[in-house]
Amino acid sequence: EGREPVIRFKLLDGAISFADLVRGEVTYDAKNLGGDPVIVRSNGIPTFTFAGAVDDINQKITHVIRGEDHVTNAAAQVRIFEALGANVPTFAHMPMLLDSDGGKLSKRLDSLSISNLKAQGFMPEAIVSYLAALGTSVDPKIAPLEDLATQFDFEAMGRAPVRFDLDQVLRLN
């Protein structure tokens, strides 16, 4: 067929379960994950799913906090952790962060980068305080970083996508 070979990770049949601090207990049937995941592309470069798991093992990561769009990756990564004899980290899949119009935020959209917001005069405390409350029912207010850290609760996080509202950050500023 003219295709270059890739390396796949054989997913054993059955349920794959893991703890998620936002979603609770998550279970996927390996048959419904779209087949055995590619772990090394035809150009020899490892995929995110594999490289992320190996990196987490090497760095002894205990918690993986990332976007909701990676929750199915976690199921395959659980099997990779197990196959490599490593502890499975605790996951927290946060709701998708959307722009003010409801579109998906892009890493390439520099206007909402932390460095760009700081350059526009936004105080770091305002940015962090807003982000700590985003996706919860908590009304954002300026607070010391230590307080935000001790009060943060993954279980208070909703699962619905949230919109980043620059006007709310401006009010905190």
Each predicted region: which residue ranges?
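Active-site cores that bind ATP or allylic diphosphates and position pyrophosphate for catalysis
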Residues: 1-105, 113
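Catalytic adenosine-cofactor/nucleotide-binding cores of aminoacyl-tRNA synthetases and other
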Residues: 72, 84-173
